[in-house]
């Protein structure tokens, strides 16, 4: 490692101590869980919302997928610029308050258009929280130890899936989907003061070493790095599959396996939570260990994970047994959560400290923009097949698209690894 590179990687003289840093990671994981709970609610409650507001599968796909994620992607970069000044806690707390408030307002909507407007507000609020959390980790953990805390934060996704399916599903079944929105949103608003207390309002950033040319690690320069562009292509396909599963799996189980909303919440919610958390912890820890030998393992581990679990993405829509179907869906869903921690850790090594939140936001921008196409296409294909296949149309659409998108994503990650090491070395030039 050259001197300039060492200067970039050891910018932690003013970092939080291990106890506080891990406590903050725990709080950020809780925030992330609420982030995804509020994001997943319309998907979990898609069936009652669809019937109450008289929406089509295409409309559900646009509101929960394309429309939400486009706003999320664009605003993420804008808010991340504030976080890059060290205002990690302030950004997260402000975003938390906004999206919680907008989720509560979602319980009062009377049309699909009004629901879409509240989801725009949720998207704006959630946009800045994740990049700020990633930047906090990069600021307070050395490069070889970032995948584990990032994995803990990313555990929010399967935990949120379980919480939204269990909590949201059971609340909706007993009190109605509108009440579920109000209660879940209120929990987010209440948590904001804890973020300011543990994470802090802002944290000072190190001065960039004089020997380093800032343009070499600038976030704009990511667009000229082959490894970043190919990883972006890979995450586009993997996230498209993941968002499709998130949006339509509950509806698929209810339509084709005869499950009630409460049963989906308990069985599918617990399965995705348990498998997702286990997968993230294993992948995050393993990625850190392997990356010490070769940083390309941050990408290779995504390839390995996807190929090992890929058969589940086919079997989930073929097997008739209800429990096997739930198990395979949860395994397929785990691809779309476990790959994030090593991917983000890889991206963080391509930029300077003051550009990390923006780099993370750029990654999530492409993840969201291209990933949002998945639910939209699945919804349209399902609607087009309904006349011929009836209730089986949604399952057929998912069968045709999910595994194919995941496979293409794995191929992209493999191709990106060929250039990744060189792109890191360029930071020292």
UniProtKB/Swiss-Prot annotation:
What is this entry's stated membrane topology? Multi-pass membrane protein
- SUPFAM superfamilies according to UniProt: MFS general substrate transporter (SSF103473)
Q: Which range is the signal sequence, renumbered to this chain?
A: none
Question: Coiled coil among the record's keywords?
Answer: no
- UniProt cross-references to InterPro entries, sorted A to Z: MFS, MFS_dom, MFS_spinster-like, MFS_trans_sf
Q: Where in the cell is it found?
A: Cell inner membrane
Q: Which residues cross the membrane?
A: 21-41, 59-79, 86-106, 115-137, 150-170, 181-201, 228-248, 264-284, 299-319, 327-347, 361-381, 397-417
* Assigned protein family: Belongs to the major facilitator superfamily.
Recorded hits in PANTHER family, A to Z, give:
PROTEIN SPINSTER, SPINSTER
What is the role of the protein in this entry? Answer: Probably plays a role in bacterial growth and resistance to antibiotics.
Q: What is this protein called?
A: MFS-type efflux pump MSMEG_3705
Q: Which organism is it from?
A: Mycolicibacterium smegmatis (strain ATCC 700084 / mc(2)155)
């Amino acid at each position: 490692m050259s001197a300039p590179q060492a200067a970039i990687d050891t910018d932690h003289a003013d970092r939080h101590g291990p106890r506080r840093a891990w406590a903050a990671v725990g709080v950020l994981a809780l925030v992330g869980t609420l982030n995804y709970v509020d994001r997943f609610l319309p998907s979990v409650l898609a069936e009652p919302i669809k019937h109450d507001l008289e929406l089509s599968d295409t409309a559900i796909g646009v509101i929960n997928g394309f429309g939400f994620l486009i706003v999320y992607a664009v605003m993420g970069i804008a808010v991340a610029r504030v976080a890059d000044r060290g205002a990690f806690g302030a950004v997260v707390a402000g975003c938390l308050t906004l999206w919680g408030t907008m989720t509560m307002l979602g319980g009062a909507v009377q049309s699909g258009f009004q629901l879409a407007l509240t989801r725009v507000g949720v998207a704006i609020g959630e946009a800045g929280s994740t990049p700020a959390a990633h930047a906090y980790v990069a600021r307070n953990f050395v490069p070889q130890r970032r995948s584990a805390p990032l994995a803990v934060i990313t555990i929010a996704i399967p935990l949120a899936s379980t919480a939204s399916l269990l909590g949201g599903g059971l609340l909706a079944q007993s009190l109605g989907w509108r009440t579920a929105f109000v209660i879940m949103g209120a929990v987010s608003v209440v948590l904001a003061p804890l973020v300011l207390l543990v994470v802090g309002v802002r944290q000072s950033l190190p001065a960039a070493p004089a020997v380093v040319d800032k343009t070499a690690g600038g976030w704009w320069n990511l667009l000229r790095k082959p490894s970043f562009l190919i990883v972006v292509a890979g995450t586009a396909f993997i996230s498209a599959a993941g968002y499709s599963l998130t949006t339509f799996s509950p509806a698929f189980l209810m339509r084709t396996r005869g499950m009630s909303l409460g049963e989906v919440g308990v069985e599918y919610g617990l399965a995705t939570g348990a498998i997702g958390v286990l997968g993230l912890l294993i992948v995050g820890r393993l990625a850190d260990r392997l990356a010490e030998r070769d940083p390309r393992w941050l990408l290779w581990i995504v390839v390995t994970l996807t190929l090992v679990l890929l058969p589940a993405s086919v079997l989930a829509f073929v097997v008739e047994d209800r429990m096997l179907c739930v198990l395979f869906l949860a395994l397929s869903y785990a691809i779309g959560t476990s790959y994030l921690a090593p991917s983000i850790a890889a991206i963080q090594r391509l930029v300077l400290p003051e550009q990390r939140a923006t780099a993370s936001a750029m990654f999530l921008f492409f993840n969201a923009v291209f990933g949002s196409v998945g639910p939209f296409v699945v919804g349209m294909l399902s609607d087009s097949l309904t006349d011929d296949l009836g209730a089986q149309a949604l399952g057929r659409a998912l069968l045709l698209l999910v595994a194919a998108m995941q496979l293409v994503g794995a191929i992209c990650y493999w191709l990106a690894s060929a250039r990744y090491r060189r792109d890191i070395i360029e930071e020292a030039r």
